[in-house]
């Protein structure tokens, strides 16, 4: 009778271990993406503050591939604001994904603890 219980617990532990490793990798990836998006957001903000100090009639060029396109100050300003907004939205999504992954691992650990407590009670 003890052998099936041991096999069941062993299987549950191996599944938990695989899930924890997979989740840790996904959380690390999300952290890296969040850091990169924060850098992008900061870069866009700093560029925008520099641009806003210039006179409205200043010629500005946007780099596209290997060429530069003449743009108005307002067009570049709106592009930078949009870039910041998109980065903030993606950061929020990644943080939600990260918290979901951490919750799912905790729930799996709690389920195994409950299974162990039930086995000890028998």
UniProtKB/Swiss-Prot annotation:
Function: Binds specifically to cytosolic chaperonin (c-CPN) and transfers target proteins to it. Binds to nascent polypeptide chain and promotes folding in an environment in which there are many competing pathways for nonnative proteins.
Keywords on record: Acetylation, Chaperone
One Pfam family from the record: Prefoldin_2
Native species: Homo sapiens (Human)
One example of a Gene Ontology biological process annotation: negative regulation of amyloid fibril formation
N-acetylalanine: residues carrying this PTM: 2
Family from the record: Belongs to the prefoldin subunit beta family.
Entry GO CC: cytoplasm; prefoldin complex
GO MF terms held by the record: amyloid-beta binding; protein folding chaperone; unfolded protein binding
Record's subunit section: Heterohexamer of two PFD-alpha type and four PFD-beta type subunits.
Annotated InterPro entries: PFD_beta-like, Prefoldin
Lineage, broadest ranks: Eukaryota, Metazoa, Chordata, Craniata, Vertebrata
UniProt name for this protein: Prefoldin subunit 1
């Amino acid at each position: 009778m003890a052998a099936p219980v041991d096999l069941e617990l062993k299987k549950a532990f191996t599944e938990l271990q695989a899930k924890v490793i997979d989740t840790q990798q996904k959380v690390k990836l999300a952290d890296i993406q969040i850091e990169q998006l924060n850098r992008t957001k900061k870069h866009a903000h700093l560029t925008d503050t520099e641009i806003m100090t210039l006179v409205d009639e200043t010629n500005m060029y946007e780099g596209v591939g290997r060429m530069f396109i003449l743009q108005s100050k307002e067009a570049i300003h709106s592009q930078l604001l949009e870039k910041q907004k998109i980065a903030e939205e993606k950061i929020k999504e990644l943080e939600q994904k990260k918290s979901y992954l951490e919750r799912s691992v905790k729930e799996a650990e709690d389920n195994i603890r409950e299974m162990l407590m039930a086995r000890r009670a028998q």
